[in-house]
Amino acid sequence: MTQKEISIIHPRPSSIVAALYTLRDLNVDVAILHGPPGCSFKHARLLEEDGIHVVTTGLDENGFVFGGHDRLVEVINKSIELFNPKILGVVGTCASMIIGEEMHDAVLEANPDIPVIEVEVHAGYHNNTRGVLFALESALDAGIIDRKEFERQEYLLIKATEVEKRFGAASKEYLAPSRGDLKYKVAKRLIELLKEGKKGLVIMNAKKETGYMFADITLAVSEVAAALGKKENLVNMANIDPELGLPRVRQHAQYIMRDFIAHGVEIHEIIGGMDEYPIAGEKVSELIKEKYSDYDFAVITGVPHAIPMENLQHMELISITNGPRQVLPLKEMGHEHVLVEIDLHPKTLGVSEIVESEFGATLREVAKEA
């Protein structure tokens, strides 16, 4: 083991689940999990709220010994009969990969007349981005995405892994979960800054559908600033370029921009697509250096740790994440106030409009008392 490598002992995201979410982003209609009935249950159920059917071959002890080829063929045919999908996904699990299941043989035998994205993956990878990459490689082979988009996604995955290892939940051997600072106290401090006429940046650097809730914080800050007559002191940035990303990701950006416009909130700087959270921070840093170096504070939502500290150090930082294990790394980076939106992800699945956040709701209520 090299000096830079660490052995992480807190639970880490699963490559199997990452593959499932990638199939969702590709607008796959049905994903078949080839493995035990309980594998990835929570996320499989949540994904069904987001428009993708997730079914399982339900391998048991007999299947572990004798294999599940026939069962996979059966479930492929049953899925086509039940759901009439335009694109089908087949995803491996620890069990099916350990026993050496050849999923491709089952797909050939079933011979569906639609594209099939086969993802041979298990949860034994240290970086869950491997599941994304495997799904994208198969999507490329199936003609669902082109080489240019694949290479773009591959680059983003490399950068995402780097960010997590340097400043995220993969940066330490063990990170205890935390709820962060009290939202009420931070809301009061933010209102003080606005009342004092301080100039602030509101930066949304969100990962895909999580933006539906992080965008509400941009709305709330804008609403409160407007009520105080200080809206002109804010500059809003967001990674909501609707031309970048896989199909579902581009759609998220379109919906969030639509809602910003409907609420009269101007996004002054578009900093990238909703899958570009690992690299959008570089653009933010450049913008601050060139145009906003005299600003006093920043409210950063989504993946704050992906934004370099170089041009933020002189600002008071209020950062909101949905990762309880992200609090300590952000504090160590120099983020003075760190908040956690608990259970954000389940609340942003299957939606197509901005969802109220805990901090947004708190800020609005505190402002009424100000």
From Swiss-Prot:
InterPro entries: CfbD, Nase/OxRdtase_comp1, Ni-siroh_cyclase_CfbD
UniProt record similarity statement: Belongs to the NifD/NifK/NifE/NifN family.
Subunit structure: Homodimer or monomer. The Ni-sirohydrochlorin a,c-diamide reductive cyclase complex is composed of a NifH homolog component CfbC and a NifD homolog component CfbD.
One Pfam family hit: Oxidored_nitro
Protein known as: Ni-sirohydrochlorin a,c-diamide reductive cyclase complex, component CfbD
UniProt keyword list: ATP-binding, Iron, Iron-sulfur, Ligase, Metal-binding, Methanogenesis, Nucleotide-binding
EC code: 6.3.3.7
Cofactor(s) the record lists: [4Fe-4S] cluster
Gene Ontology terms describing biological process: methanogenesis
